[in-house]
Amino acid sequence: MTRFEGLVPATITPMTEAGEVYEEGFRRVLDLNIDAGVHGFWVAGGTGESVLLDDEENRHLACIAAEQVSGRGIVIMHVGAPTTARAAALAEHAAGAGVDAICCVPPFFYRRTDDEIVEHYRVVASAADLPLFVYNLPGMTGVEITVDLMRRIQDVVPQLIGLKHSSSIFANVHEFARMGLQCFIGSSALMLPALSVGAVGCVDGPPLMAPEVWM
């Protein structure tokens, strides 16, 4: 079974002056970080400016990352979108591209009920036979994935394996760990205290720029 832990940098999305994904540059960033010893990558999340990417660009990044990393680390692909249908379609593609897991923010912009958020994750997870990480990013989505809401998701989504916790409620790291979830802290500044209360690693942007320092 794939181990999801350690330092997993959140990738940037290099673009050309023409506004296209800079494939060569992206591959170089991945290789430089692998050579430094990182454990994997969180692709097309907040650091990768996912909300500015169209679906074809997301799919392209999934294919590049899966091909370039090629078992030298884990690839967790973000498939979040404002609608469940779009997120599920991206999840299905990511699975076909060969990534190791998917991650997903809750649906955003229009506020959903907790029931709708749970259903969102059930549908997205069902579209891809892959482990799922919830992406708790309340500062951007306006949705806090509470411990109670996470329990509800866990009850109906067997593929749920963990989350990236980018929330100010630090105490929930311990609670999520007690639930058996693999919790990545979303702030490299909090990596050591998070590891001490049960986090399995860190997903953040700064380590991508200087992986040797963080390793």
Model-derived segments and spans:
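Active-site beta->alpha loop and helix N-cap motifs at the rims of alpha/beta catalytic domains
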Residues: T2-G142, R152-Q154
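Catalytic alpha/beta core domains of metabolic enzymes, predominantly
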Residues: S126-A127, P138-M215
